[in-house]
Swiss-Prot record:
The lineage of its organism: Bacteria, Pseudomonadati, Pseudomonadota, Alphaproteobacteria, Rickettsiales. The keyword Cell membrane does not apply. PROSITE patterns: RIBOSOMAL_L10 (PS01109). This is Large ribosomal subunit protein uL10. PANTHER family: 39S RIBOSOMAL PROTEIN L10, MITOCHONDRIAL. Gene3D superfamilies: 3.30.70.1730, 6.10.250.290. One of its GO terms (molecular function) is structural constituent of ribosome. It comes from Rickettsia africae (strain ESF-5). Forms part of the ribosomal stalk, playing a central role in the interaction of the ribosome with GTP-bound translation factors.
C-alpha cells in the first residue's frame, strides 16, 4: 500500500468504527476466496460487512475513535466484521466459524463494551431484536384475544367463566 493511500484507508476504518456499534475481530488465515465471498454475501444480506484490514491502520483508526481497548486484538491476518445489529452478525460469524476452522474469532466490541471470543459466542445464542419484538407483540396480543373470545361467547358461557373465576377466589 502506498503511503498516500494509508490516510484514506484509515478514514474508511474510522467510518466503520463510527457507524457500526458492533464489531467482531477475526483471523481469516487459510480461508479461500470463495469462502470469504460466501461470508461477505451472507453478511451483506443482514446489512453487515467484512473488511480485511492492516493491523497498524486498524490500530490508528481505533485510537482516533476512542476504541483504545481493542487495539491489542489486532495481530496476525486480521479482518473486521461490522454491523448495526450485533446478535444477527454474531450468529452469522459464529456459525461460519464452526463450519470453517480457518476463521478464528478473536474478540470484538458492542456498544463500547469489549467482548472476548466466549462472549461473542454467547451473544450469538440470544434472540435477535426482531425475534424479541415478535415475542412481545405475541404476549401483548394473547390476553386481548382471550378477552375478545370470552366477550363473543354466549352469555351462558360467560356466566360459567365468571362463576369459575369467583370460585377460585
Amino acid at each position: 500500500m502506498l503511503r498516500s493511500e494509508k490516510p484514506v484507508a484509515v478514514e474508511d476504518i474510522v467510518n466503520i468504527y463510527k457507524e457500526s456499534p458492533s464489531i467482531i475481530i477475526t483471523h481469516y488465515h487459510g480461508l479461500t476466496v470463495s469462502q470469504v465471498s460466501s461470508l461477505r454475501e451472507s453478511l451483506k444480506s443482514k446489512e453487515a460487512g467484512f473488511k480485511v484490514v492492516k493491523n497498524t491502520l486498524a490500530k490508528i483508526a481505533a485510537n482516533q475513535t476512542g476504541l483504545n481497548s481493542i487495539v491489542n486484538l489486532f495481530a496476525g491476518p486480521t479482518a473486521i466484521v461490522y454491523s448495526k445489529e450485533p446478535v444477527e452478525m454474531a450468529k452469522l460469524v459464529v456459525n461460519f466459524a464452526k463450519a470453517n476452522d480457518n476463521l478464528k474469532i478473536i474478540g470484538g466490541i458492542v456498544d463500547n463494551h469489549v467482548l472476548d471470543e466466549h462472549s461473542i459466542k454467547e451473544l450469538s445464542k440470544l434472540p435477535t431484536l426482531n425475534e424479541l419484538r415478535g415475542k412481545i407483540v405475541g404476549l401483548l396480543q394473547a390476553p386481548a384475544t382471550k378477552v375478545v373470545g370470552v366477550l363473543q361467547a354466549p352469555s351462558s358461557s360467560m356466566a360459567r367463566v365468571i362463576q369459575a373465576h369467583a370460585s377460585k377466589n
